[in-house]
Amino acid sequence: MRAIADTGLIVAFGNRTDCFHPWAVDIAKSITEPLLTCEAVLAEAAFHLRSVPYVLSLIEDGMLRIAFEMAKHQQRLAQLAQRYQDRHPDLADLCLIRLSEIFPHHTVITVDEENFRIYRRNNRETIPILCPPRSPARH
């Protein structure tokens, strides 16, 4: 599966008490190539997990690959921020929308189904997403 990793997947994978941990482990077992992501997602995940070394180890171990240079996409990120200002997207979400535009054959793996069902790549295209089955509220 060619995919892009959002923060929630990384946090769930790294936190055994997260309600989505089993789902995240199943995803990790099924991947055959590194999941693409961006620095904004990694910063969020490191914050939530309280472990920069752990998040960096996912890159070193080949589970994740940084595939985005924000400086090259500032104009598009600003357009996306303006378009979705009513949803108050964080920088990571904007970067993932842009990653989905750059890598159109990749699926975004996220626990944020509500927002990613609304976000569009290339202004009109639905972003393919993979979310956990609907389950209890996150811890």
Whereabouts are the PLM-identified features?
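Acidic, PIN/NYN-like endoribonuclease modules and their adjacent C-terminal/linker elements
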Residues: 104-139
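Active-site neighborhoods of divalent-metal-dependent phosphate/nucleic-acid chemistry enzymes
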Residues: 67-113
